[in-house]
């Protein structure tokens, strides 16, 4: 039996193949092979953006973005670039964002041919934009969200977020869902961050303890003890969760006040801790090795530094609140 041409493969088989890819970039690659494949392979499904709310004057919108590693067509180059994209709707183009600021970059007439570049998905990140129509109507010219929740994770059809009250909230996504946002019970502490780690959801409280979120029943269970905090000489310590070398770790971003700028603080250092499960004790990570840590507003993750242009190992990249620029610090 003669082998059929790629363009003549059954449409059902092409669509079945495309549906096995979880990455949007992989599905787009399948669709870009030829016109018959583009017609047969379904457009990647996007998340249900509008989330249910009991208050008709308040609209909550899920805003997902995706981090990618892109390498050029040259086979001799193994280094790539870190990019961030956002697609507003299924029919819209994919927009390029600043990886750290989530801002839309200057539009370009050029397009990225996925057949000429290696594009690999790193991770997805989420924010929840809250539009309070009472507040928006009261401010002339205001069009953006009233509030932004930047500590958000997505697991199956469940969305978890650290709310404005520093508590963990949960909501079902999907058109068939009519549930409103629900606050998880038995919360004894306020929370700073939330993360999806090995298929489980964990949250970080103010004391530096990590809590595991049980889905059935929906509740919080303490997973680790608090981190001893002895930071004399610093004005504040911002804490974040990150996965490093398979371990769940806590980042401490140490800050000092700027005397000449009101309500402004500068970052003067970082500390990273991981739990030693054998002795049930927090230990400090002295070096990131060949890794670099990316600290964005809504996402923290590590990359292999040698795989990216201009990226140095054992480094932490973050945004300086005063200069509004990306800063690098050695751990």
From Swiss-Prot:
This is F-box protein At2g26160. It comes from the Eukaryota. Residues 4-52 form the F-box domain. Signal peptide: none annotated. Pfam families: Beta-prop_KIB1-4 (PF03478). InterPro entries: KIB1-4_b-propeller, SCF_F-box_domain. PANTHER family: F-BOX PROTEIN, F-BOX PROTEIN SKIP23.
């Amino acid at each position: 039996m003669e082998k059929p041409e790629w363009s003549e493969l059954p449409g059902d088989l092409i669509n079945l193949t495309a549906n096995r890819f979880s990455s949007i970039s992989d599905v787009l690659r399948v669709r870009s092979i030829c016109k018959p494949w583009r017609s047969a392979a379904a457009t990647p499904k996007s998340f249900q953006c509008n989330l249910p709310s009991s208050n008709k004057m308040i609209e909550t919108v899920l805003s997902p973005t995706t981090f990618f590693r892109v390498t050029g067509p040259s086979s001799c180059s193994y280094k790539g670039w870190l990019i961030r994209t956002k697609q507003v709707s299924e029919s819209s183009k994919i927009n390029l964002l600043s990886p750290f600021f989530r801002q839309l970059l200057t539009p370009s007439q050029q397009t990225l041919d996925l057949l000429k570049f290696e594009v690999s998905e790193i991770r997805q990140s989420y924010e929840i934009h809250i539009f309070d129509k009472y507040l928006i109507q009261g401010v002339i010219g205001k069009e953006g969200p009233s509030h932004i929740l930047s500590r958000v994770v997505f697991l199956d059809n469940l969305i978890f977020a650290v709310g404005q009250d520093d508590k963990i909230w949960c909501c079902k996504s999907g058109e068939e869902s009519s549930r409103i946002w629900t606050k998880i019970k038995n919360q004894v502490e306020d929370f700073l961050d939330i993360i999806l780690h090995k298929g489980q959801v964990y949250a970080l409280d103010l004391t530096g303890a990590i809590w595991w979120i049980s889905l059935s029943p929906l509740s919080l269970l303490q997973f680790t003890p608090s981190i001893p905090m002895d930071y004399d000489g610093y004005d504040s310590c911002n804490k974040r969760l990150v996965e490093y070398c398979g371990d769940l770790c806590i980042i401490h971003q140490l800050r000092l006040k700027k005397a000449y700028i009101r309500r402004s603080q500068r970052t003067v250092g970082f500390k990273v801790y991981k739990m030693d499960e054998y002795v049930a004790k927090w230990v400090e990570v002295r070096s990131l090795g060949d890794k670099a840590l990316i600290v964005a507003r809504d996402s923290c993750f590590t990359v292999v530094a040698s795989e990216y242009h201009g990226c140095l190992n054992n480094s932490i990249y973050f945004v300086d609140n005063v200069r509004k620029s990306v800063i690098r610090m050695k751990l």
